[in-house]
């Protein structure tokens, strides 16, 4: 049983979800809001995040609630690697739509660690792939004419060496 006080979030689809405050404060948006406004006891609306995504975000925050807060010093080393720990890799084994919704929610809620894991997951999905393979992976239509594509390839030959 948790001894942390709880908060209630209301998802964009109107579902109330109870969350331990220490878990909720993995979100800098929520942490700063609570510091500025205090605890009102009312449900906190999370207008950009539906129930399924919010539950996934809370699951990640619960697993990482004891992680040290990230500092500015971590930023450079964090960005230089696409390594993801095993639990996070399993957590991110979701369909593409859910993956992108988690990334958007992490950005909106200002949860840097989760945003990093989501972005690294996408980076690993495209690493070493050709533009055609990337388009296929993400179901992206090619809007270049063959002439434009040839010109781009010629201009960027140096990148393929």
UniProtKB/Swiss-Prot annotation:
Keywords: Ubl conjugation pathway. Pathway: Protein modification; protein ubiquitination. GO terms for biological process: exit from mitosis; G1/S transition of mitotic cell cycle; G2/M transition of mitotic cell cycle; kinetochore assembly; mitotic nuclear membrane biogenesis; negative regulation of cytoplasmic translation; negative regulation of mitotic metaphase/anaphase transition; positive regulation of D-glucose transmembrane transport. Residues 103-161 are annotated as: Interaction with the F-box domain of F-box proteins. SUPFAM superfamilies: POZ domain, Skp1 dimerisation domain-like. It comes from the Eukaryota. CDD domains: BTB_POZ_SKP1. One of its GO terms (molecular function) is DNA replication origin binding. The lineage of its organism: Eukaryota, Fungi, Dikarya, Ascomycota, Pezizomycotina. This is E3 ubiquitin ligase complex SCF subunit sconC. Essential component of the SCF (SKP1-CUL1-F-box protein) E3 ubiquitin ligase complexes, which mediate the ubiquitination and subsequent proteasomal degradation of target proteins. Controls sulfur metabolite repression, probably by mediating the inactivation or degradation of the metR transcription factor. Coiled coil: none annotated. GO terms for cellular component: CBF3 complex; kinetochore; nuclear SCF ubiquitin ligase complex; RAVE complex; single-stranded DNA-dependent ATP-dependent DNA helicase complex. Component of the SCF (SKP1-CUL1-F-box protein) E3 ubiquitin ligase complexes.
